[in-house]
Amino acid sequence: MAVLSNDQVDAALPNLPGWERAAGALRRSVKFPTFLDGIDAVRRVAEFAEEKDHHPDIDIRWRTVTFALVTHAAGGITEKDVQMAEEINRILSD
């Protein structure tokens, strides 16, 4: 899978509310009402990621969860990461 150019990532970001490009990855931080709400969101994202065999890096800091997406095997952000960001947004809105 090809790494997206900076222009391609910039074009995708307006369609990915809450996401930004940082440190070579797509990143989104979400503050949940409670710690357990954050853990539940991580579980739902993890189940989908397992199904797709594309796993975000996930950082949990009390009620704030940060998701980071980069295709390590390709060495950068790919269309697979953009699609996963869209799905994470869908999962979090449920």
Curated annotation (Swiss-Prot):
**Which example biological process does GO assign this protein?**
tetrahydrobiopterin biosynthetic process
Q: Which domain of life is it from?
A: Bacteria
- Give GO MF terms, alphabetically: 4-alpha-hydroxytetrahydrobiopterin dehydratase activity
The record's catalysed reaction(s) read: (4aS,6R)-4a-hydroxy-L-erythro-5,6,7,8-tetrahydrobiopterin = (6R)-L-erythro-6,7-dihydrobiopterin + H2O
Q: What sort of enzyme, by top EC class, is this?
A: lyase
What keywords would UniProt list here? Lyase
Q: What is its EC number?
A: 4.2.1.96
Which HAMAP family does this one have?
Pterin_4_alpha
What the record says about family reads: Belongs to the pterin-4-alpha-carbinolamine dehydratase family.
The name this protein carries in UniProt is Putative pterin-4-alpha-carbinolamine dehydratase
